[in-house]
């Protein structure tokens, strides 16, 4: 249990969608890291002044670090191929909401999510790698502001916080995250900067989870955890809640009672995004609490690989993870 107060930037927006909209049975959640998604105009503006290191959160810039891949230059055909996946999320998967990572705000997201979506609740960050949401049109929601405490050093990413069906019996709170990269396996207490930053972020997420449990409302945490949670959950968090040595048992510790989480990818074989995907384990995931799980005992997992015909296009190094939840 963490008692630390979390300060979220209050949203100036109220309800979006129709407060009287009737939810369908269940809820379908998805998450997608879109690999430096920005408009062509923004890319062209930033490319001549790219930086030799990763920009800070307050800098609208991207890196051109020697020896490392640069943000992709996308054509309209690339955006169209990505939009095909967004259409699959809307039509085939019936996704209600998609947590987005590495997207430079609503204008960039609209290049891909161009029909049937509201693009909102993006974090207040200058850096092009923003976290936000694509919400199915007509679904009522409220932006709760940034979980700014996740930016632990001025260069890591805040969380995006949204409530679906606010004020109704179907209310669900969601936190979208893109945690520090580089510490995919092993203990967090190593003298390695990515692990040190991730270890600082862990109690921020736990405090958010604990607050939701005390409120008694269903919730989920979804996004790019940059961590192989299947391995992580096998090991204890350690005695210090403010500095855990692993993530899952820190977050899912039943303290306070009810702080127990289920993972979308648990027991699921890794599905590659395309022919060049040589990963063996997921780092994108969806975690739901006991209330959401008990109300939706039928759960359908999907991973949307890209169309083989689009192999070689500038798409993303991630593809969507989907979890359909029904009673």
What are these regions (language model features)?
Residues 12-115, 126:
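N-terminal, active-site-proximal structural segment of metallo-dependent hydrolase catalytic domains
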Residues 13-21, 207-220, 226-327:
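Metal-dependent phosphoester-hydrolase catalytic domains
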Residues 18-19, 67-76, 88-89, 93-100, ...:
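Second-shell loop/turn segments in exported
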Residues 29-34, 66-78, 85-109, 174, ...:
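Active-site beta-strand/loop signature of hydrolases that rely on acidic residues for catalysis
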Residues 43, 167-200:
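Metal-dependent phosphoester/phosphodiester hydrolase catalytic core
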Residues 78-85, 94, 105-108, 130, ...:
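Stable alpha-helical elements in mature extracytoplasmic
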Residues 97-180:
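Structured beta-strand-rich core segments of catalytic domains in phosphoester-bond hydrolases
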């Amino acid at each position: 249990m963490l008692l630390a107060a979390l300060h979220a930037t209050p949203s100036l927006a109220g309800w979006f969608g129709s407060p009287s909209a009737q939810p369908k049975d269940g809820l379908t959640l998805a998450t997608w890291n879109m690999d430096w998604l920005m408009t062509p105009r923004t890319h062209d503006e930033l490319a001549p002044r790219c930086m030799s290191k990763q920009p800070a959160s307050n800098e609208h810039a991207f890196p051109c670090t020697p020896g490392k891949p640069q943000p992709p230059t996308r054509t309209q055909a690339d955006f169209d191929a990505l939009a095909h996946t967004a259409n699959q999320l809307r039509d085939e998967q019936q996704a209600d909401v998609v947590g987005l990572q590495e997207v430079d705000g609503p204008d960039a997201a609209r290049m891909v999510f161009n029909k049937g979506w509201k693009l909102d609740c993006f974090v207040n960050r200058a850096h092009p790698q923003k976290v936000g949401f694509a919400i199915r049109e007509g679904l009522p929601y409220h932006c709760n502001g940034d979980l700014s405490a996740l930016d632990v050093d001025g260069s890591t990413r805040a969380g995006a916080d949204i409530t679906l069906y606010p004020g109704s019996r179907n209310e669900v709170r969601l936190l979208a995250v893109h945690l520090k990269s580089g510490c995919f396996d092993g203990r967090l207490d190593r003298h390695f900067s990515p692990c040190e930053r991730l270890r600082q972020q862990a109690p921020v997420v736990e405090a958010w989870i604990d607050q939701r449990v005390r409120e008694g409302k269903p919730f989920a945490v979804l996004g790019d955890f940059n961590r192989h949670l299947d391995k992580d959950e096998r090991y204890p968090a350690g005695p210090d809640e403010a500095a855990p040595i692993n993530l899952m048992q820190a977050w899912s510790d039943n303290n306070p009672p009810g702080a127990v989480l289920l993972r979308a990818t648990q027991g699921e074989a890794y599905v590659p995004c395309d022919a060049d995907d040589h990963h063996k384990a997921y780092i994108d995931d969806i975690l739901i609490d006991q209330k959401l799980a008990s109300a939706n005992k039928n759960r359908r997992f999907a991973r949307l690989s890209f169309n083989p015909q689009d192999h070689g296009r500038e798409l993303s190094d991630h593809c969507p993870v989907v979890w359909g939840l029904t009673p």
